Amino acid sequence: MSIYLTAEVPGTGGVIKATPEDFLVEEIPAYLPSGQGEHCFAVLEKRGIATLEALRRLAKALGVQERDLGYAGMKDAIGITRQTISIPRVAPEKVLALEIPGITVLSASMHGNKLRLGHLKGNRFVIRVRDVAQGAAGNAEAALEIMTRRGVPNRFGVQRYGAQGNTHEIGAAMLRREFKSAVDRLIGDPAAVTDERWRLAIEAYRRGEVAESLALFPGHFRVERELLTRLVQRPDGFERAFNSVQPRMKRLYLSAFQSSLFDLVLGKRLDSFDQVNVGDIAFKHENGACFLVQDLAAEAPRAESFEISPTGPMFGCTMMESHGAQGELEREVLAAQELTLESFNLSGGLRMEGERRPLRVPIAGAEVRQDGSDLLLDFSLPRGAYATCVLSEIMKSD
């Protein structure tokens, strides 16, 4: 079974994100500011700055509370990103006059409400792939044609799993209450890091030299240092040590684990991810509603026209369950982890209710242009979908 939807099309190879200008992300807003209200909607262009860091700099420059700023989606630090931020009770003229390193204010206008997470249609991507193989443009066009017709596999992919690619393993250990395993994975694998001091700190921990590991970990590794501090105090207190992790980080680990199981289910369903079956939970692309497929004759044409798509599980204690073959697949995947849906019913603000996620998403406005030995790609995806899913199918460099 291939990991690629477009397995019959040769990959282009190449390199992405060689410079910030090689990767442009631009939000497609769900609505435009009305021009009236108490929230200033500012469109920022950020160069090599993540969303949360931009919020910090913006709040400091304007003398407002960071928590009062609103945003529709999270953007990472790699590349150039254009996104809207809402700021309460600040005039557009004041925002437009700001001079913040790495941030340019492109426009500003007032609106009646604070911008909330999810208040966007999607994102447009303009990406340069450098040093591609011969015939790359034709192969990229062929891969994009398949994805335009059948959909883009809605994977999370490796960027979901942290710098060492193992945050989902921490989440799995949490759910099984295997706290030593969770701590071991959080401290990390020396083979997965390139920084010398970081590697030495991990190696010291693995030798059982916890105090030395603590001394070696740089100060900005706050989570790791707090874990190790507690282990120095009580060497066998792994649950106590792990409880020092903030709930926000614990939810991130649990979410990464959910994502890894979704990706696993998608991989097993890839050959038919654009077709619905009786027992599937289908997703309506128009409004995000989900329903159980019972009448295949009625629903199959809707999947063919991309009105609906089958879904996969973001496992949780109240998640809507599939029936039939898809339901059996999902139960097998969860049973292999020695977990049930009730396992996600955690206390302490960590309860994971779960949801359904479409196995595919539509791609819009896809264009390819050859520029010497580079490819220029331009396409749009709905919110919550990742450009890396498209790039993986085109480049096949995984």
UniProtKB/Swiss-Prot annotation:
What is the superkingdom listed in this entry's lineage?
Bacteria
Report the record's Gene Ontology biological process terms. Answer: tRNA pseudouridine synthesis
Reaction catalysed by this chain?
A: uridine(13) in tRNA = pseudouridine(13) in tRNA
Keywords associated with the record: Isomerase, tRNA processing
Q: What class of enzyme is it?
A: isomerase
Spell out the PROSITE patterns in the cross-references. Answer: TRUD, UPF0024
Q: What is its EC number?
A: 5.4.99.27
Active site positions, chain numbering = D76
Per UniProt, residues of the TRUD domain are 151-361
One GO CC term on file: cytosol
Regions crossing the membrane: none
An annotated Gene Ontology molecular function: tRNA pseudouridine(13) synthase activity
List, alphabetically, the Gene3D superfamilies matched. 1.10.1510.30, 3.30.70.3160, TruD, catalytic domain
Which PANTHER family does the annotation name? TRNA PSEUDOURIDINE SYNTHASE D
Q: What does this protein do?
A: Responsible for synthesis of pseudouridine from uracil-13 in transfer RNAs.
Q: Which family does it belong to?
A: Belongs to the pseudouridine synthase TruD family.
Q: Which NCBIfam families match?
A: tRNA_TruD_broad (TIGR00094)
Protein name, UniProt field = tRNA pseudouridine synthase D
Species of the source:
Geobacter sp. (strain M21)
